[in-house]
Amino acid sequence: MTNRTVDETRRPQTPLRWAIAGAGTISRSIVPDLQLLPGNHVEIIFSRNPANAASFAEEFGLDRWTDDFDLLVRDPGVDVVYLATPFATHAAMARQALLAGKHVVVEKPMALNADDVQDLFALA
């Protein structure tokens, strides 16, 4: 037994609705896996490059894409944001998503320094 408990009000209900940030190689690997998992649905892809986002959405049968990360984190139809963007963007984007009330899965490294990591832990 630990002295920590799970805040059940923050536990997402299924299906988990995923937003993918980054239309590169790692996202091309993770999206098919998410699409195979019961209780998970990939809702939207984000890329800073609209053509890449549109192409990714078409390739993986996603209905929506965006080049606006602010829009993505404000989307009430998204529960989880998966960050597979250049690593220098991870901390800021994770912070933005956490502040918007989203669950976040971030590729390594989570941040470029320990202070940013501690900040993200505190927000989560």
What are these regions (language model features)?
Residues 1-60:
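N-terminal Rossmann-like dinucleotide-binding module
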Residues 60-121:
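Beta-loop-alpha module in the N-terminal Rossmann-like domain of NAD(P)-dependent dehydrogenases
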Residues 124:
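Conserved donor-nucleotide/metal-binding helix-loop-beta segment in metal-dependent transferases, i.e.
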